[in-house]
Amino acid sequence: MASAEETFFSAARSRRLACDRCHRHKLRCERSSVIVNGGVAVPLGPCKRCLKACIPCQTVQTISGAFTAAKTGDTPVPRRSAREADQAASPAKRAPSPARRPTASTPRNVPGLIHDDTLSGTDTAPFEISVADAAMLDVSNFDFSGSEFIDLGSNGVLSSPTPIQSPPDHGSLIRDSEIRDRTPIPPHNQPPPRYDDFANDLSCFGTMAPKDDTISTLPALTDVEKASTGSSKSAPERGPREECSQRLLEIHGLLLNELQCITPADVTDALMFPENGSFSGRTRTGQGPGNTVVHRVLFTSERLIELLSIIRAADTAINGDKREAGIGPRNTSSFVDLPIVISILTCYVGLLSVYHAIFSHIYEALRVYEPLRAAKIRQRAWTRRGSVPGPKPGPGLVQPRAIYGADEAGGRPALNVLGIRIQLEIMTHMLEQIDSALFGPRVAHGADGDEGRTDTINRGGEVMFGHPATKALLATMLSHEGYDSGVPVGPFADGDGDDDDDDGYMEGMRGCRMGFRTLMGLQKNIRRLLRTNSFG
């Protein structure tokens, strides 16, 4: 048996044995293995590159010194004699070209890439081969159909190639009658077109070659056209109504997701004892507006003020009716007249409820804290050395334990009074900003009284929600939530102290501001507790 060196040629010799097409384009010919028998090199089968391009593999070039013997000292055998070459060149004795396989299921089937004549049947010299070599030489044992392509998306399983899809309909550019058959059959008795530059061979890139210049095609876009197309497809600038809808969606999401549930532990973490860590079991992620309940409510308040500013700017730009014309539908055929004003009032009432819950938790925590602190001082006096006789702590003595984050010893840590005052002032200022954006700025009285009152009434009539139906709706919503338009009672009895805050406003504005009045009364009660009691 011949050795491996005698069986396979080197890379240099394989290039000399390449087919005409691979030799001309300087490609590595993917022909089958080569058998050396008696100094004759026998190629097995055509080149796979030619088969993929549906081109007959041709080897009609005269290669000098291509066939070398396996043993040193043998002379190269000529490929064929001159007489055989003359017989092969004659048209009468030329062998028929091999039949083309109907492999029209891949975009590499591009006709017209044949440059030379077909391979003659007398190109091979007589030689002797074994039975095993004859089986390898039988072309019927090899399948060069489309099933040899591997579908990469199916984990390497052999599958049939995807058929060629029909070209898209471009309207007036290509009519149905102009869509021709793409079967790669060259015209009869016409030489196929030649491609001098191999880079133009579209079969190597998996795309379809142009069939005819008469068919209209879509021109490729330049960089300038692509840039202009991208800019034209960009989203148009949003108007006041779109901005208003976006803000409303954000505020509703914050109220229903972040501020729907507020527990005393949340207020404790945010205001009462921030230096002692978290006393609640709620897990918090990240920093920023959503860190504590106070941060979240301030963030929502800023969004509501921005929304009211957008509406005020839209109403100011429109002359005539003082109603909510700026956020109305610009075109009834494309915009639905949604109750945006009612949604804004709903956000306002919901935000007032959040502030009321926070202020109520602070007020109740300060009221409960003082008795527990006094009990803790008395307990320390009982257990101190040298103190007067008194009851000793035992099983029957209830240890004073706070309802808001008590420590292990049963006592209460010192309150962060400065932090409570600062956060309370910030929330109060935010409420005043919302009230001013919704109902207009408040004007102080003049020296004579009448002039200042007239100025206030005029400003009250210019507010964006100054329509009587809107004010009546807001007053009804506040009453439904439990706010009272009169002087508050109970823990808020001392509220504003007098009724001067409403002087200068129209009578209808009194019911609209009863939620703000209630919160201001509760805020003053918290200030009184912080001022009169010693929390330390």
Swiss-Prot record:
Region listing for Disordered, in residue ranges: 70-122, 220-243
GO molecular function: DNA binding; DNA-binding transcription factor activity, RNA polymerase II-specific; zinc ion binding
SUPFAM superfamilies for the chain: Zn2/Cys6 DNA-binding domain
Coiled-coil annotated residue ranges, if any: none
Phenotype of null mutants: Drastically reduces the transcription of chaetoglobosin A biosynthetic genes and completely abolishes chaetoglobosin A production. Abolishes sporuration.
Key words, A-Z: DNA-binding, Metal-binding, Nucleus, Transcription, Transcription regulation, Zinc
GO cellular component terms given for this protein: nucleus
Reported induction: Expression is regulated by the developmental and secondary metabolism regulators laeA and veA.
DNA-binding region: 19-57
Compartment(s): Nucleus
Tagged with keyword Membrane: no
Protein purpose: Transcription factor; part of the gene cluster that mediates the biosynthesis of chaetoglobosin A which has a unique inhibitory activity against actin polymerization in mammalian cells. Chaetoglobosin A and its intermediates are involved in the morphological differentiation of C.globosum. Binds directly to asymmetric direct repeats present in the promoters of the chaetoglobosin A cluster genes.
Name under which the protein is recorded: Transcription factor cheR
